[in-house]
A protein has these predicted regions:
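Short catalytic/metal-binding and nucleic-acid-binding patches
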Residues: 1-130
Length: 130
């Protein structure tokens, strides 16, 4: 499928480098400043899967959180790799989890994304998956 082709790191892959992936991981960790926990994520060569869990004190909208994450990480990546143009696509997709089963399914999906893409044999082998 086209998803497997893209997930495997073909085409434009601005997150392929260790430095770019580290930049995204740092920005995910920095969301704690806004009382957002990020218990699970997978930084793929050309996209990101992340579980964002707002704390009780979080007053930011999901849109503002994603805007901050994309903006700050794009700025950092551009400083690293140079060039022009977008790092992230404009759109993004969310999923609200209403049960433990949905939560577990989402965690499994995030963790297994690098495996399904053929990047690693087990999710634990992928440096940028939590």
């Amino acid at each position: 499928t086209i998803e497997k082709y893209l997930d495997a790191g073909h085409g434009a892959c601005p997150l392929r480098s260790e430095q770019a992936s580290a930049c995204v991981a740092d920005e995910l960790a920095a969301l704690a400043d806004w009382q957002i926990d990020v218990p699970h994520y997978a930084i793929m060569p050309n996209h990101l899967h992340a579980m964002l869990v707002p704390g009780r004190g979080c007053v930011r909208s999901l849109s503002a959180i994603v805007k901050r994450l994309k903006g700050r990480s794009a700025h950092g990546i551009r400083l690293l790799i140079g060039g022009r143009g977008a790092i992230w696509q404009r759109e993004w997709f969310d999923r609200w989890m209403r049960s433990d089963a949905e939560y577990r399914k989402c965690v499994d999906y995030i963790r297994n994304n690098p495996v399904k893409a053929g990047l690693v044999a087990r999710w634990e082998e992928h440096r940028w998956t939590r």
